[in-house]
Every structure is written in C-alpha cells, then in structure tokens.
Amino acid sequence: VDLWGMNVYRWDNPENIFKQWSALSDKPMYLSEAGSDSYMTVANHEFSKGENEKAQAHSLNNILDDVFEYRSINSGVLVFSFTDELWKAGNPNIQDVGGWAPASSGVPYDGTANEEYWGILGVDRDKKEAFYVLKGFYNKKN
C-alpha cells in the first residue's frame, strides 16, 4: 500500500485523525470522503432546523481548515458529495429528509446524515454556499 484513504466524519474537526495517523504510520494518507449535509433535523449550534446551507458551508470551512493545516501529513480530501442525490431515501423523484445512519455522531451539527442533502450542488445543479467555500480554499491556496 502506497497511500491510505479514509472516510472520516469527526463532526467538523478532523484534526486529531491527522495526529493519530502520524503517530501510527509514515505512509501518506488522504481523506477519501469528508463533508456534511445541508439539512438540520433539529436546531442546534445556532443553526436553524430545515434546509440549511450555512451549516454545511460552516462545517466544510472548518474541515478544509484542518485539511490544509496538516498538509505535511494529509495529501488531500474528496468532498462528499458533488451533487445532492434524490435516490438515497424515500421517493426517488423528490428530495427527502432521512436516509441511512440516523444519529451518526460524526455528522455536523445535528448528528443525522440526511443522505439526499450532501452535495455542494443541489439536485438542479445550483451552487450551494459550500461550493463557494470549497472554491475559495483552492483559489487562495494555489
């Protein structure tokens, strides 16, 4: 194995995975999946219940801060996911709340992975606030 990829969901703070990895191995690693959804099942951490792009953008900003801060350990990140996915829960023709992994402790900020709301683009390919966060990181880091 030349490179390890890990799907890591540690709220909006993956920092300790990089520290843990560096203590375990000198092989390179990257986050093969990280992100958050744009639906708040409950109001929490000053984010309102319902569709909430601000919560998703805020958590992605925090995740990317850590990713770029630990570049000596971490080779990068694949943000999950590019677009919202209608087929993940309930009716495949409408965007539903819910899906797999309710009460997932690693999902910001409500602990619930609303599977159809993880995209940085909406179902109609409209750019969410998280898209601009990601774009901004790569524009300022290059």
Predicted regions and their residues:
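Extracellular glycoside hydrolase catalytic/binding regions
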Residues: 1-69
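Residue-level signal for the start and early helices of compact helical domains
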Residues: 20, 73, 109-112
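Short, solvent-exposed beta-strand-terminating loops
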Residues: 27-38, 75, 80-93
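C-terminal structured "cap/appendage" subdomains that terminate the fold
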Residues: 57-71, 80-85, 94-97
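Aromatic-rich peripheral "rim/lid" segments of glycoside hydrolase catalytic domains that contact
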Residues: 80-142
